[in-house]
Curated annotation (Swiss-Prot):
Lineage: Bacteria, Bacillati, Bacillota, Bacilli, Lactobacillales
Family: Belongs to the RNA polymerase beta chain family.
Reactions mediated catalytically: RNA(n) + a ribonucleoside 5'-triphosphate = RNA(n+1) + diphosphate
Biased composition (Basic and acidic residues): 1171-1188
Subunit structure: The RNAP catalytic core consists of 2 alpha, 1 beta, 1 beta' and 1 omega subunit. When a sigma factor is associated with the core the holoenzyme is formed, which can initiate transcription.
EC number: 2.7.7.6
Protein name: DNA-directed RNA polymerase subunit beta
Function per UniProt: DNA-dependent RNA polymerase catalyzes the transcription of DNA into RNA using the four ribonucleoside triphosphates as substrates.
GO biological process: DNA-templated transcription
Gene: rpoB
Length: 1202
């Protein structure tokens, strides 16, 4: 028997076919969220205050400093925040110190800075009662980047860009004549030498002395420069030129130019490279990173002893560079100090490191390599040394020295996680607040003012609220199942503020890059316009302090070439320097390689190389893919397009009533379920004392009792049912981090997205055509694929001009039968079964006072009370929303609930539906093999096996060959073996069961060796002609259910302006009869059908009502009138100043009557407006989902009587 037994958690053992030993545990899968937020709370927030403070007033009299901050206890717990539609947040208090420099007086005060949203343990935020996830963003890293493009003659043109975190961009470029230019902040270009002169190096000799006189592009640029032979101060002239480019039309002076350039580049408040920008810039420009492979044109000696380190003519190898590195790190080695002229922007001396080498393109030419000195990582702004060194790099590229950058390389793209995104948002708020504080400082009396009076927290609160509420990266959490949650938290988006837009992103950005290996999943990405822009973090990847993605590798000892268990995490640009063996390379027990030649990766190349060259080895075969992709068994046998669909569709699997973990899994299911946040996890070790459906109590070793409350029938974001079930028994010992209770889509601690039905690949009466699925009625009867869905509905009683709305049982014109499940307040009881149109909350709204008729006056005189003028505005069950009332929540002002202004009472009703699998539901396996149910076949009619077992699902064999997802067949056969042997299997991706293992397992289970069997037709008892592949496969029911999609309308709401029916199920709209459908009717000459579609059934408002009357009264249907949209068109053309008239056959003008001029009793504009006013409350529910044009849900009075 191949394989070995492995325990997953305490409750599940599987036979695993993996051959590679796990040297590294999977990390906590949501640490990208939690670590980033913790950093923000501990360091990021303080950094922000230190950046903005101290704030000084314009006269320098007052100074406001930051001392400390603290977060107090949150107002609500996580569950309370969810229930009250509130935020899970804690009050932020900041201690500020105000110093009066004139009197020396110091005032300290604690200032409230608003409520700050807290992250839950699951890595989410609760905003307005809904769980949200902040998606990490993938952006270009700040730094300096060089690019190369060939012109039409095939000559290389180089360009460079300095990208800051915030501030002005600096770009270099050469034109067709090889003259170099610079652009500041995307303005017009100016010769590069003008920038050098503005930095204080005014004469041509200084420039040639610094950069070397042999550079062709430099001499051409100097020739082009207008100040070439100017006698007066060239520095000032250059400054004026730059000012003219940046501020055209304004009077130019050297002083204004200096202050403008200082503000643009050298003011830390305006220009920020961030630590990562400084790190990247130093890595690109420092001398020690640029010498490798160059031929020295001077002898290098130790400055202290004079010992020769390298001779002129030596080529710098790795060994020589290692020897030189300690010297290159010194401040006094090959360092030249240049002093700019006094008119320069920055007058401090500039220290550069400079070494002469020979040009690669012309080995007789000597060119300098200039490094930017030793600028510490704390310097977040650009320095003149950076600009000069980057210009030198630019000139050197034309000599063949240095390399251009690939912007899609993950060394040049970084992750902005929650913490940094929040920090940036907070910075915006604080910067707005700073302006207000400065203004208040100058207005208020300095002797009496306190910090509290200066601070206005509104901009800070608003920017945080805006970020959580409406940022593109703050998303409503995908809560279909635990895998969907987990993947959402690990998602990386290139979209969003400061990122790309869908329309501008080309193929290169979206494509898989070799640096994605072990960092971003090459498989899991959406289909459609976002493909390649939204990615998923690989399973072992982590994000370092600079925001670059790292992936772990096992170090290979360079002495004896053995693989050690020492793990190094490498970023993409570090990895480029190493050769890395694959995880499945055969090893001996002592860690040495079995073969002398092994397959390895060198950048984007796969090579076979000697063991001596190997630096690292992969940690695990699954480090390449994300968690969802790693859940697909036999992934290596599937075509990547189908694997992509498989990974995406697992996230859409609906939690079933009684799920089963897959018989054939990959072994990552336990970790995925554990880290997703839906399971109940033990915090500390102990012994289980009590278990029921609602709570588990664990006695800790020190005697304290921990009570874990389980989640019961909670509605998730996606309207699914989230429920926890205990899996531990009384007396059982649990360790910290053990699973105590399964969440939704879990079984025995493992992810269980679907079921393991018996599947045959066969055709059946054409019901398999085009990916359709024929299923056994047993799956319906036994609730195998039954799921519970919970929908919530709200009704608010508001204060109106005519008096308050009232929740009551006494609703006008409603029979007792409709009120049978309502209590005295008109609210439905929990447990009642409701159907479409039933009342959930009885509510009446006061109507306007009207003139009383004689009869009403008589009644009023007799009974002394006016018959109540109210309208029925009850909340009713919408179409397709019937079910069992699962919960009712009532919020009132008296109970201290926070309600929006004008609302007295709010009732929320939860309706649970039990949905069995039915025709039209979408199902899928894990290999992208999706289809819809086409027929439910009675159990007795299904094909059955020789032992009488009927098949559960029949799939079309045509769905396999062309799609090349062969993994489903291997899963089918191994699943059959597991089913017959009564065990669970694990076959990890890229390291799972081989073909031989699968057939050995089939043979061991006693099933025919080819995995096929004779099936008998359930209707005739005859055997089918050929043997059929039968087995067990994990099959899911997806969230695309026919109940949510089916929709029908006779009459309903119309759009206000065009009077055409609305569209879409959410608005109870009609089916659009579009341009092409009209052509089809025209082709048949179906004139009358076409006419009624364009008039009665659409926007002929008068005709609609008359037609309705005629049908009711059994009369012939009248002639149609003029469609409203035609009138709209005429009015729009008239608004353009065109004289539009409608003429008849005799060229006589037809007067189009307005709707309210019609003599018949029809619905006119005023009636519609009044009706809309009355029904506003009714239609509040639709407003959220209403994605159409500005619509008003108005239904004609008469039409609505039915």
């Amino acid at each position: 028997m191949a394989g070995h037994l492995v325990k997953y958690g305490k409750h599940r053992t599987r036979r695993s076919y993996s051959r590679i030993k796990e040297v590294l545990e999977l990390p906590n899968l949501i640490e990208i969220q939690t670590d980033s937020y913790n950093w923000f709370m501990e360091k990021g927030l303080r950094e922000m205050f230190d950046d903005i403070m101290p704030i000084d007033d314009f006269q320098g009299k007052l100074s406001l400093e930051f001392v400390d901050y603290q977060l107090l206890e949150p107002k609500y717990t996580v569950d309370e925040a969810r229930e009250h539609d509130a935020n899970y947040s804690a009050p932020l208090h900041v201690t500020l110190r105000l110093t009066n420099h004139e009197t020396g007086e110091i005032k300290s005060q604690d200032v409230f800075f608003g409520d700050f949203p807290l992250m839950t343990d699951q890595g989410t935020f609760i905003i307005n009662g809904a769980e949200r996830v902040i998606v990490s963003q993938l952006v270009r890293s700040p730094g300096v980047y060089y690019s190369e493009e060939n012109d039409k003659n095939g000559r290389p043109n180089y360009g460079a860009t300095f990208i800051p975190n915030r501030g002005a961009w600096l770009e270099y470029e050469t034109d067709a004549k090889n003259v170099s230019y610079v652009r500041i902040d995307r303005t017009r270009k100016l010769p590069m030498t003008e920038l050098i002169r503005a930095l204080g190096f005014g004469s041509d000799d200084e420039i040639i002395d610094m950069f070397g006189g042999d550079s062709e592009t430099l001499s051409l640029t100097l020739d082009k420069d207008v100040h070439k032979n100017a006698e007066d101060s060239r520095v000032e002239e250059a400054l004026k030129d730059i000012y003219e480019r940046l501020r055209p039309g304004e009077p130019k002076t050297a002083d204004s130019a200096r202050s403008l350039l200082t503000a643009r580049f050298f003011d830390p408040k305006r220009y920020d490279m961030a630590p990562v920008g400084r790190y990247k810039t130093n890595k690109k420009l420092m001398l020690k990173y640029r010498l490798l492979g160059q031929t020295l044109a001077e002898t290098l000696a130790d400055p202290d002893t004079g010992e020769v380190l390298a001779q002129k003519g030596d080529t710098v190898t790795k060994e020589l560079l290692n020897k030189l590195e300690p010297y290159l790190d010194r401040d006094d080695f090959k360092t030249i100090t240049y002093t700019p002229s006094d008119e320069a922007v920055v007058t401090e001396p500039v220290k550069l490191q400079k070494i002469l080498v020979y040009s690669k393109n012309d080995p007789d030419r000597v060119v300098p390599i200039i490094g930017n000195g030793h600028i510490p990582l704390e310097y977040k702004h650009i320095e003149p040394a950076d600009i000069l060194a980057s210009l030198n790099y630019f000139f050197n590229l034309q000599e063949g020295i240095g390399s251009t950058d690939d912007i899609d390389h993950l060394g040049n793209r970084r992750i902005r996680s929650v913490g940094e995104l929040l920090q940036n948002q907070f910075r915006i708020g604080l910067a707005r607040m700073e302006r207000v504080v400065r203004e208040r400082m100058s207005i208020q009396d300095p002797d009496t003012v306190t910090p509290q009076q200066l601070i206005n927290i509104r901009p800070v609160v608003a920017s945080i609220k805006e970020f959580f509420g409406s940022s593109q990266l703050s998303q409503f959490m995908d809560q279909t199942n635990p895998l969907g949650e987990l993947t959402h938290k690990r998602r990386l988006s290139a979209l969003g503020p400061g990122g790309l837009t869908r329309d501008r992103a080309g193929y290169e950005v979206r494509d898989v890059h070799y640096t994605h290996y072990g960092r971003m999943c090459p498989i899991e990405t959406p289909e459609g316009p976002n493909i390649g822009l939204i990615n998923s973090l690989s399973s072992y990847a982590r994000v370092n302090k600079y925001g670059f993605i790292e992936t772990p590798y096992r170090r290979v000892s360079w002495k004896d070439h053995k693989v050690t268990d020492k793990i190094d995490y490498l970023t993409a640009d570090e990895e480029d320097n190493f050769i890395i063996a694959q995880a499945n390379t055969p090893l001996n027990d002592d860690g040495s390689f079995v073969d002398d030649q092994v397959m390895a990766r060198d950048k984007d190349d796969y090579i076979e190389t000697s063991v001596e060259n190997i630096d690292y080895m992969d940690v695990s075969p699954k480090q390449v893919v994300s968690v969802a992709s790693a859940c697909i068994p036999f992934l290596e046998n599937d075509d990547s397009n189908r694997a992509l669909m498989g990974a995406n569709m697992q996230r859409q699997a609906v939690p079933l009533i009684n799920p089963h973990a897959p018989l054939v899994s990959t072994g990552i299911d336990y970790k995925a379920a554990h880290d997703s946040g839906v399971a109940m996890i033990a915090k500390k070790p102990g012994t289980v004392e009590y278990v029921d459906a609602r709570e588990v109590r664990v006695r800790e070793e020190d005697g304290t009792l921990d009570t874990y409350k389980l989640m019961k029938f909670r509605r998730s974001n996606g309207g699914k049912n989230y429920n926890q079930r205990p899996i531990v028994k009384v007396g059982e010992h649990v360790d910290a981090d053990d699973v105590l209770a399964d969440g939704p889509s879990m079984e025995q601690g493992e992810l269980a997205l679907g079921q393991n039905p018996l599947i045959a690949f066969m055709t059946w009466q054409g019901y398999n055509f085009e990916d359709a699925i024929a299923i056994n009625e047993r799956l319906v009867k036994d609730d195998v694929y039954t799921s519970i869905h919970i929908e919530s509905y709200e009704s608010e009683a508001r204060e109106t001009k005519l008096g308050p709305e009232e929740m009551t049982r006494e609703i006008p014109n409603v029979g007792d039968d409709a009120l049978k499940d309502l209590d005295e307040n008109g609210i439905v009881r929990v447990g009642a079964e409701v159907h479409d149109g039933d009342i959930l909350v009885g509510k009446v709204t006061p109507k306007g006072m009207t003139e009383l008729s004689a009869e009403e006056r008589l009644l009023h005189a007799i009974f002394g009370e006016k018959s109540r003028e109210v309208r029925d505005t009850s909340l009713r069950v919408p179409h397709g929303g019937g079910g069992i009332i699962q919960d009712v929540k009532v919020f009132t002002r008296e109970n201290g609930d926070e309600l929006s202004p004008g609302v007295n009472t709010m009732v929320r009703v939860y309706i649970a539906q039990k949905r069995k699998i039915q025709v039209g539901d979408k199902m899928s396996g894990r290999h992208g093999n999706k289809g819809t149910v086409s027929i439910v076949v009675p159990e007795e009619d299904m094909p059955y096996m020789p032992d009488g077992t009927p098949i559960d699902i029949m799939l079309s064999p045509m769905g396999v060959p062309s799609r090349m997802n062969i993994g489903q067949l291997l899963e089918l056969h191994l699943g059959m073996a597991a089913r017959r042997l009564g065990i669970h299997m694990a076959t990890p991706v890229f390291d799972g069961a081989s073909d031989k293992d699968v057939w050995d397992a089939v043979r061991e289970s006693g099933f025919p060796e080819d995995g096929k069997t004779i099936l008998y037709d359930g209707r005739t008892g005859e055997p089918f002609e050929n043997r059929i592949a039968v087995g067990s496969m994990h099959y899911l029911k997806l969230a695309h259910m026919v109940d949510d999609k089916i929709h029908a309308r006779s009459t309903g709401p119309y759009s206000l302006v065009t009077q055409q029916p609305l569209g879409g199920k959410a608005q109870f709209g009609g089916q659009r009869f579009g341009e092409m459908e009209v052509w089809a009717l025209e082709a048949y000459g179906a004139a009358y059908t076409l006419q009624e579609i364009l008039t009665y059934k659409s926007d002929d408002t008068v005709g609609r009502v008359r037609t309705y009357d005629a049908i009711i009264n059994g009369q012939p249907i009248p002639k149609p009138g003029v469609p409203e949209s035609f009138r709209v068109l005429v009015k729009e053309l008239q608004a353009l100043g065109l004289d539009m008239k409608v003429l008849d056959g005799n060229n006589k003008e037809i007067q189009l009557k307005n709707m309210d001029e019609d003599d018949d009793e029809v619905v006119n504009v005023d009636a519609l407006a009044k009706y809309a006013e009355e029904h506003k409350a009714d239609d509040k529910k639709n407003e959220e989902e209403n994605k159409s044009e500005a619509t008003s849900t108005t239904t004609d009075d008469k039409t609505n009587q039915n």
